């Protein structure tokens, strides 16, 4: 709201409806909204599957998800940076610079998330034990976090690619990738593994 900022918004300014801007907002924003809804509904479906396994498994799943979410922070940061830098570069008609920014953001995210993966692999049980003294829950949570640890570099790539695509105005692509990944791969695979194996909670995290 300060007039000295590069982009300032003042309350006394007159806001007039601009159809072109509104259409652009909807075109770019709607897929992002649907992407988040798709992922959230998928998480609900996975939690419902885990609930059917048992109480200890549900508690371990919840606590492991909490511990896991902390490790995503570096990738979220690099993803946001990629979106901003790619959009800025493309707007300046400098696609070569956009590619460089994309590569650096990808590299940084992979390095940080690999380090976070090591923390989850070797310290997963300790992280879960910070939330509960229950030995069974701690053991289950530590086991699934080891699985998650191996996927950390790939999550880093996925998250930064999403940021890059948003910066390049390709939000529909990120929505399709998220929808297919959740509802064509993850949910069906978890369902099949739960029905055909005795792996229990591990099924949801393998998927």
Segments predicted by a language model, with ranges:
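Short alpha-helical transmembrane segments in multi-pass integral membrane proteins
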Residues: 1-29, 86-151, 194-207
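Hydrophobic faces of transmembrane alpha-helices in multi-pass small-molecule transporters and flippases
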Residues: 14-45, 70-74, 78, 145, ...
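Helix-terminus/linker motif at the lipid-water interface of multi-pass membrane proteins
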Residues: 33, 37-70, 88, 126-135, ...
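C-terminal structured "cap/appendage" subdomains that terminate the fold
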Residues: 161-165, 172-203
